[in-house]
């Protein structure tokens, strides 16, 4: 098993890159397929470890899955209510099966989730939502169990616009009696994609993409065909790669509205970004400017792009401040970037980055998915050779990242 990336200073990236289907869209959509009584066909499924885990998880419940060349066929006949630790420990998104199983069978038992080590990321908002709908929740021996004879629509206010909680409650509510209203709901494009898929199956959901989502309960959901939206974080990552290396790259299969905040920040740096028929063209500039960033829930600047932008800021002209408001403990890439010569100071949830002349290659490790991506980007511009360990994190969220970069002229390979 090749466990590290070796990256050498690369020429400006040039060419075209096609963005894969969105990981953060496909995981809840696969979970939602458990609600259907007929066959579901999903297209543009990214070939990722997290997706394989989610497929294994729904197979555990009795789903029949056939994945071929990005097309996933799912037939559901739920035989079990329990999701075991072996599967759930691999990623947090496993918990998204709780809403559908509870809605379909009135009983779900899911192991407490694992996944990326980013701060607390509690599931309490999910559980409060299920309780509001009438479920009894018990927690013990590492499992969460939910039971309900019948779920009933309610008004649910989320203390924080959590994406996972919004999705899980939305799925749990599709069969509930009456109307469920989620207030302070997350507005991410992935929520809209999930709602569109549920509606294709026969759900009655309005307001996805706003802070108030209204779900009118229905009796059953039928089969549907759906193409997953492109991955806005992968798109953003390749936009930054093109910008940092002074390249000229066409990003294909991107929904421009989904990356507006990234476009705004890169443009502020001096990068030239234009919409073309095939997608977005990103042209880097020499001596780009430092910019300040504050991560926020969508449509604000995504926390999932914070590490990549920090890598870019390490050699920008001037000083930038990055404030992380979404997740705690999300500066784990800082110590690794410092090993490469970056000048970064951390104070609480703020990072101050003073641009240096150049980074130097070093041996570093990916501590999580986006940290790994940031180190790959830093390696592209660092003098000499960078070795990035623990790249299994990167494989959880990027389809063949090194192959896509190599096709643009990057010097990167697995070892």
Swiss-Prot record:
UniProt: UDP-N-acetyl-alpha-D-glucosamine binding residues: 92, 121-125, 304, 326
Entry's EC annotation: 2.5.1.7
Residue positions binding phosphoenolpyruvate: 23-24
Protein's GO biological process: cell division; cell wall organization; peptidoglycan biosynthetic process; regulation of cell shape; UDP-N-acetylgalactosamine biosynthetic process
HAMAP family: MurA
Recorded metabolic or biological pathway in which this protein acts: Cell wall biogenesis; peptidoglycan biosynthesis
Taxonomy, superkingdom: Bacteria
Cellular localisation: Cytoplasm
Protein purpose: Cell wall formation. Adds enolpyruvyl to UDP-N-acetylglucosamine.
Active site: 116 (proton donor)
MF term (GO), any: UDP-N-acetylglucosamine 1-carboxyvinyltransferase activity
Pfam family, one: EPSP_synthase
Gene Ontology CC entries for this record: cytoplasm
Protein name, entry field: UDP-N-acetylglucosamine 1-carboxyvinyltransferase 1
Family statement: Belongs to the EPSP synthase family. MurA subfamily.
Modified residues (2-(S-cysteinyl)pyruvic acid O-phosphothioketal): 116
Keyword vocabulary terms for this entry: Cell cycle, Cell division, Cell shape, Cell wall biogenesis/degradation, Cytoplasm, Peptidoglycan synthesis, Pyruvate, Transferase
Classification via CDD domains: UdpNAET (cd01555)
Root EC class: transferase
Catalysed reactions listed for this entry: phosphoenolpyruvate + UDP-N-acetyl-alpha-D-glucosamine = UDP-N-acetyl-3-O-(1-carboxyvinyl)-alpha-D-glucosamine + phosphate
